[in-house]
Amino acid sequence: MGQKINPLGFRLGITKNHNSHWFAKPNNYSEFLQEDRKVRNCIDNYVHRHVKNSSNYGGVARVEIQRKTDLILVEIHTGFPALLVESHGQGIEQIRKDVQQNLLDSKIRRVHVTSTEIAKPYGEPNILAEYIAIQLENRVAFRRTIRKAIELAKETDIKGIKIQIAGRLNGTEIARVEWAREGRVPLQTLRAQIDYCYYPAQTIYGVLGIKIWIFRDEE
């Protein structure tokens, strides 16, 4: 049953922390939750417009949001900050303007956006899944792509990884699921630090679903 539940939500409060750090009254909770979704959508849209292309990817691992009375703090964890900052000279400032314009409406609140570099980006499942998606969209064989992704991940300090791809692999008529694992991935162990992500790849044959589980360590 370990694969039937999201590994991140399963460990929330044990080995995983929330990506949004704020408190709200019951009347404001849904509003703040929707605003957080809009912030993340603004960042995704900027990355797809200005950074990501057929040979390049955004490299955003996660976005953390903190709130104060009149201030929203947004921290972007990225493996390749140069792409995000230097793509149009003022990338972070443009993201801040987009968020301010699309999010705050007429409310008087300030937005502060920062970026944090991840030392070993291929140890992050979101970045690794984005790499796999680009390879599949460029018609690289899925088995070769999985092998290369595992090699990149093994260069970081992880103890195990599992990659699963589902869909019309290599353009076959019947969809199927293929997966590969290296090392241990103990999904049932709550103290195990497991990172997980799902990422869709848009190919000419349809959508391929990519799932990655990364086992870092045990607490």
Swiss-Prot record:
Residues 47-119 form the KH type-2 domain. It holds the Pfam family Ribosomal_S3_C. It is found in: Plastid, Chloroplast. One of its GO terms (cellular component) is chloroplast. It comes from the Eukaryota. PROSITE patterns: KH_TYPE_2, RIBOSOMAL_S3. Keywords: Chloroplast, Plastid, Ribonucleoprotein, Ribosomal protein, RNA-binding, rRNA-binding. GO terms for molecular function: rRNA binding; structural constituent of ribosome. The keyword rRNA-binding applies. InterPro entries: KH_dom-like_a/b (IPR015946), KH_dom_type_2 (IPR004044), KH_sf_prok-type (IPR009019), Ribosomal_S3_C_sf (IPR036419), Ribosomal_uS3_bac-typ (IPR005704), Ribosomal_uS3_C (IPR001351), Ribosomal_uS3_CS (IPR018280). One of its GO terms (biological process) is translation. NCBIfam families: rpsC_bact. Part of the 30S ribosomal subunit. Belongs to the universal ribosomal protein uS3 family. HAMAP family: Ribosomal_uS3_B. This is Small ribosomal subunit protein uS3c. The lineage of its organism: Eukaryota, Viridiplantae, Streptophyta, Embryophyta, Tracheophyta. The gene is rps3.
